């Protein structure tokens, strides 16, 4: 894939091909790591049901913590990529923005992961610890040929707007410079400003799905705009796993990301 021409590690390239579509060179990832931060939310109480639904809808990968994989994160259905999330923190912690490392790259490999991910809150009081973790783990990933996704979120006492183009661009660039192969970050809300974020980041950017939107059309239009601005995919959790038609909304996202269909056409995939 052209966007990964700078990566010479064969192991990384093989794994990246499992989570990125070879034709579109984009990805649709469904994060389901929310159980650690927020508890057993609706939609992920039984991860196997949701994993099967998003796999049937065409998603490229699911993302979750190691425990769910060991307990069985899927039941039947088509193959789907697996991303192991290495960071943890809870909403009931004295410092919800602090994320700590709870597994290893080697453990993720033993579970058959196609990539690992880390969460970094840029601007948090403990952000320097997360930067150190990202930098060190990127070296381990390079050694083992494991793709690394950095979730780079502007979040902390000095962050007034988490979608501010300047802070989003800074967060994305920071993740790339510390060794991430793929950056997940906020969409700025505007294609023109997001283009500048993409220009300033040497690693491909996948947008976060964000909080649950009011309408499917609003959400899908955001995905459409981000792809046209240079985004290389979407990683959306709640807007997918809490949808009434999980398979349908996943298929709608895939239609936009991989086939560049219009929002009106993609909405036809949703049956409920």
Swiss-Prot record:
| Entry keyword Nuclease | no
Q: Which GO terms describe its molecular function?
A: fructose-bisphosphate aldolase activity; hydro-lyase activity; transketolase or transaldolase activity
Recorded E.C. number(s)? 2.2.1.10
GO terms in the biological process aspect are:
amino acid biosynthetic process; aromatic amino acid family biosynthetic process
Entry keywords, A to Z: Amino-acid biosynthesis, Aromatic amino acid biosynthesis, Schiff base, Transferase
Known SMART domains for this protein? DeoC (SM01133)
User: Which amino acid positions bind 1-deoxy-D-threo-hexo-2,5-diulose 6-phosphate, per UniProt?
Assistant: 33-37, 153-155, 209-210, 237-238
SUPFAM superfamilies referenced in this protein's UniProt entry, alphabetically:
Aldolase
Gene disruption: observed consequences: Cells lacking this gene require both aromatic amino acids (AroAAs) and p-aminobenzoic acid (PABA) for growth. In the presence of PABA and AroAAs, growth of the mutant strain laggs about 30 hours behind that of wild-type strain. By complementing the mutant strain with the expression of aroA', the strain grows in minimal medium with acetate only. Aryl acids do not replace the requirement of AroAAs for the growth of the deletion mutant strain.
One protein family per Pfam? DeoC
Q: Where is the active site?
A: 33 (proton acceptor), 153 (proton donor), 184 (schiff-base intermediate with substrate)
Catalytic activity as recorded in UniProt: 1-deoxy-D-threo-hexo-2,5-diulose 6-phosphate + L-aspartate 4-semialdehyde = 2,3-dioxopropyl phosphate + 2-amino-2,3,7-trideoxy-D-lyxo-hept-6-ulosonate
* Annotated family: Belongs to the DeoC/FbaB aldolase family. ADHS subfamily.
Record's subunit section: Homodecamer.
Q: What does this protein do?
A: Catalyzes a transaldol reaction between 6-deoxy-5-ketofructose 1-phosphate (DKFP) and L-aspartate semialdehyde (ASA) with an elimination of hydroxypyruvaldehyde phosphate to yield 2-amino-3,7-dideoxy-D-threo-hept-6-ulosonate (ADH). Plays a key role in an alternative pathway of the biosynthesis of 3-dehydroquinate (DHQ), which is involved in the canonical pathway for the biosynthesis of aromatic amino acids and which is also a precursor for the biosynthesis of p-aminobenzoic acid (PABA) in M.maripaludis. Does not possess fructose-bisphosphate (FBP) aldolase activity.
- State the HAMAP family in the record: ADH_synthase
**How is this protein named in the record?**
2-amino-3,7-dideoxy-D-threo-hept-6-ulosonate synthase
Q: Which gene encodes it?
A: aroA'
